């Protein structure tokens, strides 16, 4: 069910995921088809048939919207484009590689309904992650360092499946790779964050867009930047007009 009164906007950034977008769009519809929802796929400069495969689904899936970047801008920019275009007050995100299960989105919605006043619900894959042992170790170390330095209390910020307030997201500072630091950035705004266990699936089509070295060095630089942002931010300013 879709329409102008959208409850949930599902934002999916994709780049060269031609083989994944069709099954993923169908899974999103299966998970949310009885709700007022929309799904927004952002094609971030793909050079394969990602956009063409999505366009073929438009008549079958009226809730599907397709945005396209004219050149590759990165996952955070794609997510931000989708959130700005979203019509719903709540936004769910998924990675475009098919490893996040759209069937977990209703679980996050239930958590939202049971935890009024929480603005970000983070997926946590730790118990179900389907990656190599090295990838799991790499992620565990990165999450430990990040959590220790930022104090965000979130065990798995790299998980692509999230549900959050669109209003709060639009207040956040924009920078490349910001999607990896949403808990710290939401908390910077005074928002509450909780983690919810979700499933995780192996990648069966396509290839990862990230390597070990770019994750490592970019992560180190970005953690320093987020620490600076948190120190410099002053909240709670009340402006009164007499």
Region locations from a protein language model:
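Hydrophobic helical membrane-anchoring modules
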Residues: 1-7, 114, 144, 149-152, ...
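Short, flexible, basic/aromatic active-site loop/helix in glycosyltransferases
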Residues: 115-157, 162-170, 223-225
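Short-chain dehydrogenase/reductase
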Residues: 72, 132-135, 139, 176, ...
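Short, conserved alpha-helical segments within structured domains
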Residues: 75, 157-164, 178, 182
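Generic alpha-helical secondary structure signal
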Residues: 23, 49, 136-144, 215, ...
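Structured catalytic core of nucleotide-sugar glycosyltransferases
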Residues: 1-130, 167, 171, 184-196, ...
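Residues that recognize and position ribonucleotide moieties
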Residues: 84, 135, 162, 179-180, ...
